[in-house]
From Swiss-Prot:
<keyword id="KW-0043">Tumor suppressor</keyword>
<feature type="region of interest" description="Disordered">
    <location>
        <begin position="391"/>
        <end position="413"/>
    </location>
</feature>
<dbReference type="InterPro" id="IPR020568">
    <property type="entry name" value="Ribosomal_Su5_D2-typ_SF"/>
</dbReference>
<feature type="region of interest" description="Disordered">
    <location>
        <begin position="469"/>
        <end position="555"/>
    </location>
</feature>
<dbReference type="GO" id="GO:0016447">
    <property type="term" value="P:somatic recombination of immunoglobulin gene segments"/>
</dbReference>
<dbReference type="GO" id="GO:0009410">
    <property type="term" value="P:response to xenobiotic stimulus"/>
</dbReference>
<feature type="region of interest" description="Disordered">
    <location>
        <begin position="578"/>
        <end position="597"/>
    </location>
</feature>
<comment type="function">
    <text>Component of the post-replicative DNA mismatch repair system (MMR). Heterodimerizes with MLH1 to form MutL alpha. DNA repair is initiated by MutS alpha (MSH2-MSH6) or MutS beta (MSH2-MSH3) binding to a dsDNA mismatch, then MutL alpha is recruited to the heteroduplex. Assembly of the MutL-MutS-heteroduplex ternary complex in presence of RFC and PCNA is sufficient to activate endonuclease activity of PMS2. It introduces single-strand breaks near the mismatch and thus generates new entry points for the exonuclease EXO1 to degrade the strand containing the mismatch.</text>
</comment>
<dbReference type="GO" id="GO:0048298">
    <property type="term" value="P:positive regulation of isotype switching to IgA isotypes"/>
</dbReference>
<dbReference type="InterPro" id="IPR042120">
    <property type="entry name" value="MutL_C_dimsub"/>
</dbReference>
<comment type="similarity">
    <text>Belongs to the DNA mismatch repair MutL/HexB family.</text>
</comment>
<feature type="binding site">
    <location>
        <position position="45"/>
    </location>
    <ligand>
        <name>ATP</name>
    </ligand>
</feature>
<dbReference type="GO" id="GO:0004519">
    <property type="term" value="F:endonuclease activity"/>
</dbReference>
<keyword id="KW-0539">Nucleus</keyword>
<dbReference type="GO" id="GO:0006298">
    <property type="term" value="P:mismatch repair"/>
</dbReference>
<dbReference type="InterPro" id="IPR037198">
    <property type="entry name" value="MutL_C_sf"/>
</dbReference>
<dbReference type="GO" id="GO:0048304">
    <property type="term" value="P:positive regulation of isotype switching to IgG isotypes"/>
</dbReference>
């Protein structure tokens, strides 16, 4: 017996070649993976042949037949024999040609693999041939039948019963044909968008019914026109063209790129993307197409970056994206995966930096647009003042000693109008501070409040101040709104800074701060804003650390408002009333210099006298202790091995706790749980064998009510006065027609006109309404996307789920409600009837493991 086993082992270890037929089937199954891959290979062959018209015909979504016809150059008769043989191609002759290949195909595997997986028939006619030829191939790619076949120039490839030579895959293919079909259509849409000057059409025929158009393009030469042909003109209204910008220094630093060493003009990116305004995006990533040298691909990093940047401006939607990256073919490796969808790219970080900089620049310019209502304002005296936006953006002319007088009366009126407008914003009048001559300047200094942190360093750049000099100038910063002035008035009253009577008619001076300061000193709340103190500075020495030059305000004759400097006041400084100051205060005497500041922050080594003490230590006692611990650990090992729940009750371990519950608790166990009581009028304590659980009574009841509403509620429909036309693609329209019952349960009703053109057959006649909730076409798009992935499965739009979650919350048992034993048992039993009992619709956990009684008793 032992001798026989040894012989069989030796035979199993022998290395032998696999027969050619098995190799062909194994490798072919790795080339053609799905319906979309098969269609992709045939479409690429037609485009490589120079076709301007490509017609794709499907029967039963591609299960029975896939047929692609084109008007390309056709196949010459001398190439018939090698047409469907493995690794036979006219695209390349050697490996070196791979870097210069410009066609989609180059490996010579597509037709050979299709022959191994299905029945393939090809009819073709070359431009030099007088009549076409029909070729029938066997599963090895060899011609079994060759007959004359009259047809125009071009090629038609028919693939029947795809995957039928692989029984398991064929059954799986039939079962998931709707998903396969949806993926195929998305791949086809990518080729329709990028193929300029090529008219692509696709039809599907169910049984003996009519051929239903799926996609149809007009053969336009531009990408924008192709997008409109595939997705409709409405989609174009929300798109903006991609504008490429060179990578910024900040983005280059983020990706570890050197701006001096990065190659210039390596990539050229073109395409379109959704506007960042809410409503312009989509609820899913179903319309995102990326191309490298016009080859459709799936660049995961690029896709992730585009969505992340878009979510910076529109958190709740995804963009429609069509981007084509043009780059030298020597910088690209397309021979990575069988379907050629994964592409390796040199300088990928540079491409990401270019995309991020460009997208941020595009969205910033779009997000910063604000529509301003031109409304008249009242000045202090009650007169109307017209708001001129263009005039407000101009700097206010200063009245300097050497400035020329105004030449035009129109200019004087304009200045007067703006001055009166600024006075209208001055809601808190204070006494005007007189000018002290050319040798002095006024400095408005802001002291940090007790909540404000102390700045760590002085600004090192040269400070430029804007303002006006003179005793009659009354300024308000254009960045100050009326609300800000009101907040400032409140602060000054609270801190005792108001020093004028209510009847004073003189305006207060609020010089404008340089824009470079605003980012360093943000005001988070009225309570956190700095209280202000006006100090008259004679010889003010504004000297940045490390420089020998001093910047004196009197050299410029400007009134300035300075930022709080470092260490200007302790962090716990209280607010105080304004006191009279001497006319000349030398701020530099009160401020610690750079040297003293840095010296206070440096740790100084201190010499310490340490006393040495002998410690008694026994190695034998330590070894004895270690043996005892190991023995105790061995005893407890089998006792602790049965612990099923180890996650803590904390937000950071919610996912781990949920995974443990899903693994260890089945639906039938809820009925077996023993009710121990109610804790804190909000939680039910249950016991299952030796495990104690805590159940949130509100969350558990809310989830049960939510699932019941999801399953059984039929939304009431509000009929429209006139049917509404939907801007759907042919594929989305087909999905809608096939799932009309699910739409009706969600409150949407349609009228279907079979004789109408495709994309215009379905019209909306009623919408769901429920009290204050209204729904619209965007919910229809979301349902179509969900049904494309799971056809025939009952699903709800996200806004319907939100409505059900709100209703379930209001009708559930609330925290603080006392429950008797039967009511608590009812809630626990309901948890066993749910599909997902671990979280309420708003994300709160319903149940957590508390303790194991065996572990507690042992301890």
């Amino acid at each position: 017996m032992e001798q026989t086993e040894g012989v069989s082992t030796e035979c199993a270890k022998a290395i032998k070649p696999i027969d050619g037929k098995s190799v062909h089937q194994i490798c072919s199954g790795q080339v053609v993976l799905s319906l979309s891959t098969a269609v992709k290979e045939l479409i690429e062959n037609s485009v490589d042949a120079g076709a301007t018209t490509i017609d794709l015909r499907l029967k039963d979504y591609g299960v029975d037949l896939i047929e692609v016809s084109d008007n390309g150059c056709g196949v010459e008769e001398e190439n018939f024999e090698g047409l469907a043989l493995k690794h036979h191609t006219s695209k390349i002759q050697e490996f070196a040609d791979l870097t210069q290949v410009e066609t989609f195909g180059f490996r010579g595997e597509a037709l050979s693999s299709l022959c191994a997986l299905s029945d393939v028939t090809i009819s073709t006619c070359h431009g030099s041939a007088s009549v076409g030829t029909r070729l029938v191939f066997d599963h090895n790619g060899k011609i079994t039948q060759k007959t004359p076949y009259p047809r125009p120039k071009g090629t038609t490839v028919s693939v029947q019963h795809l995957f039928y030579t692989l029984p398991v895959r064929y059954k799986e293919f039939q079962r998931n044909i709707k998903k396969e079909y949806a993926k195929m259509v998305q791949v086809l849409q990518a080729y329709c968008i990028i193929s300029a000057g090529v008219r692509v059409s696709c039809t599907n025929q169910l049984g003996q019914g009519k051929r239903q158009p799926v996609v149809c393009t007009s053969g336009s030469s531009g990408m924008k026109e192709n997008i409109g042909s595939v997705f409709g003109q409405k989609q174009l209204q929300s798109l903006i063209p991609f504008v490429q910008l060179p990578p910024s220094d900040a983005v280059c630093e983020e990706y570890g790129l050197s701006t001096s060493r990065t190659p210039q003009n390596l990539f050229y990116v073109s395409g379109f993307i959704s506007q960042c305004t809410h409503g312009a995006g989509r609820s899913a990533t179903d319309r995102q197409f990326f191309f490298i040298n016009q080859r459709p691909c799936d660049p995961a990093k690029v896709s992730k970056l585009v969505n992340e940047v878009y979510h910076m401006y529109n958190r709740h939607q995804y963009p429609f994206v069509v981007l084509n990256v043009s780059v030298d073919s020597e910088c690209v490796d397309i021979n990575v995966t069988p379907d050629k969808r994964q592409i390796l790219l040199q300088e990928e970080k540079l491409l990401l930096a270019v995309l991020k900089t460009s997208l941020i620049g595009m969205f910033d310019s779009d997000a910063n647009k604000l529509n301003v209502n031109q409304q008249p304002l009242l000045d202090v005296e009650g007169n109307l003042v017209k708001l001129h936006t263009a005039e407000l953006e101009k700097p206010v002319p200063g009245k300097q000693d050497n400035s020329p007088s105004l030449k035009s009366t129109a200019d004087e009126k304009r200045v007067a109008s703006i001055s009166r407008l600024r006075e209208a914003f001055s809601l808190h009048p204070t006494k005007e501070i007189k000018s002290r001559g050319p040798e002095t300047a006024e400095l408005t200094r802001s002291f940090p409040s007790e909540k404000r942190g102390v700045l760590s360093s002085y600004p090192s750049d040269v400070i430029s101040y804007r303002g006006l000099r003179g005793s009659q100038d009354k300024l308000v910063s254009p960045t100050d709104s009326p609300g800000d002035c009101m907040d400032r008035e409140k602060i000054e009253k609270d801190s005792g800074l108001s020093s004028t009577s209510a009847g004073s008619e003189e305006g207060f001076s609020t010089p404008e701060v340089a824009s470079s300061f605003s980012s360093d000193y943000n005001v988070s709340s009225p309570e956190d804003r700095p209280s202000q103190e006006t100090i008259n500075c004679g010889d003010l020495d504004c000297r940045p650390p490390g420089t020998g030059q001093s910047l004196k305000p009197e050299d410029h004759g400007y009134q300035c408002k300075a930022l709080p400097l470092a260490r200007l006041s302790p962090t716990n400084a209280k607010r105080f009333k304004t006191e009279e100051r001497p006319s000349n205060v030398n701020i530099s005497q009160r401020l610690p210099g750079p040297q003293s500041t840095s010296a206070a922050e440096v740790d100084v080594a201190i010499k310490m006298n340490k006393r040495i003490v002998l410690l008694e230590f026994s190695l034998s006692s330590l070894a004895k202790r270690m043996k005892q611990l190991q023995h105790l650990k061995a005893q407890n090992k089998h006792e602790l091995s049965y612990r099923k729940f180890r996650a803590k009750i904390c937000p950071g371990e919610n996912q781990a706790a949920e995974d443990e519950l899903r693994k260890e608790i089945s639906k039938s166990m809820f009925a077996e749980m023993e009710i121990l009581g109610q804790f804190n009028l909000g939680f039910i304590v249950t016991k299952l064998k030796e495990d104690l659980f805590l159940v949130d009574q509100h969350a558990a009841d809310e989830k049960y009510n939510f699932e019941m509403l999801q399953q059984h509620t039929v939304l009431q429909a509000q009929r429209l006065i006139t049917p509404q036309t939907l801007n759907l693609t042919a594929v989305n329209e087909a999905v809608l027609i096939e799932n009309l019952e699910i739409f009706r349960k969600n409150g949407f009703d349609f009228v279907i006109d079979e004789d109408a053109p495709v994309t215009e057959r379905a019209k909306l006649i009623s919408l769901p309404t429920s009290k204050n909730w209204t729904f619209g076409p965007q919910d229809i798009d979301e349902l179509i996307f969900m049904l494309s992935d799971s056809p025939g499965v009952m699903c709800r739009p996200s806004r319907v789920r939100q409505m059900f979650a709100s209703r379930a919350c209001r009708k559930s048992v609330m925290i603080g409600t006392a429950l008797n034993a039967s009511e608590m048992k009812k809630l626990i039993t309901h948890m066993g009837e749910m599909d997902h009992p671990w979280n309420c619709p708003h994300g709160r956990p319903t149940m957590r493991h508390v303790a194991n009684l065996d572990v507690i008793s042992q301890n």
